[in-house]
Amino acid sequence: MADGEDIQPLVCDNGTGMVKAGFAGDDAPRAVFPSIVGRPRHTGVMVGMGQKDAYVGDEAQSKRGILTLKYPIEHGIVSNWDDMEKIWHHTFYNELRVAPEEHPVLLTEAPLNPKANREKMTQIMFETFNVPAMYVAIQAVLSLYASGRTTGIVLDSGDGVSHTVPIYEGYALPHAILRLDLAGRDLTDSLMKILTERGYMFTTTAEREIVRDIKEKLAYVALDYEQELETAKSSSSVEKNYELPDGQVITIGAERFRCPEVLFQPSLIGMEAPGIHETTYNSIMKCDVDIRKDLYGNIVLSGGSTMFPGIADRMSKEITALAPSSMKIKVVAPPERKYSVWIGGSILASLSTFQQMWISKSEYDESGPSIVHRKCF
């Protein structure tokens, strides 16, 4: 395999919250780190520490006390290209330890990513990193491939944004894609707020990470929200303890399901938007009547914010209530869905049929960044 390793494609899934990167053909990403770039708040505090002008990922996270943290990706879309370049540089050279000029690179993008963004991504890959070939794939489509399907509707909910993406025979249907600016980060904020009401103060960026951990470890989706609230009032069956880094132990009860309930009832945090179940239904209704049956039968969950226990059953219950009564509804929640975008990319980049799909350096040199619209769709 010494030979193959050289040309093994790299797969990099850039999320709002986490970067997932690794080698095509692997079954999991080698590197998973926060999509953050930290810059020192005060220059020269750490004299003689060989202070860098910027820290990326876990290092930024661990030094967060002295840094200002920035997320270059907002709502799934790159908004700060200088920082994004730093993240890619860190991915190739520090995490994967590869020379990008020796490997084809598969990148992922949010559904409905603006055209200028795809071009900028393409340009940076070829001009800054000198990659021999690259491709840009839509995240939700990769998740569907990872589940072994080519037709279905994907609810992809990450840290910064959620999308419902109907896909037919491998192609996303852009007119029916819906975006919901409600995702993991909002759930963390909402839990911070609920905990503040109870007298626990979480305010800084560092403390937000603690709340995120509480959310990931303890939150779940109730099948029947009102009934669960009653249960929580009358018994302590939903209560769990969590030990903070300083040793203080807090007890959380109804907060455990109040937090992800926001996905189904955005009005709980004052958002005027339909919940994920309604958004999924609306997406299906924007599709041709002939393919709806295939979509209802293949609702695939993807992304970190679909990892809550109970979410698939609740989703199934809510969509059954909206859909025609005779319709067969199936909600699929693959256990590896936190990384299914990356896994789908790994599968796609290793297919022999995919090898002619790459945009090569020579094609880029000939046509410029707009080549991406002709070759990646």
Curated annotation (Swiss-Prot):
GO terms for molecular function: ATP binding; hydrolase activity; structural constituent of cytoskeleton. Keywords: Acetylation, ATP-binding, Cytoplasm, Cytoskeleton, Hydrolase, Nucleotide-binding, Protein transport, Transport. One of its GO terms (cellular component) is chloroplast envelope. Constitutively expressed at high levels in young expanding vegetative tissues. Also strongly expressed in the hypocotyl and seed coat. Little or no expression is detected in mature pollen sacs, ovules, embryos or seeds. Its main location: cytoplasm. SMART domains: ACTIN. Gene3D superfamilies: 3.30.420.40, Actin, Chain A, domain 4. It is found in: Cytoplasm, Cytoskeleton. GO terms for biological process: cell division; Golgi to plasma membrane transport; protein localization; protein transport; response to auxin; response to light stimulus; response to wounding; root development. Polymerization of globular actin (G-actin) leads to a structural filament (F-actin) in the form of a two-stranded helix. The binding of profilin to monomeric G-actin cause the sequestration of actin into profilactin complexes, and prevents the polymerization. There are 8 actin genes in A.thaliana. This is Actin-7. It comes from Arabidopsis thaliana. The gene is ACT7.
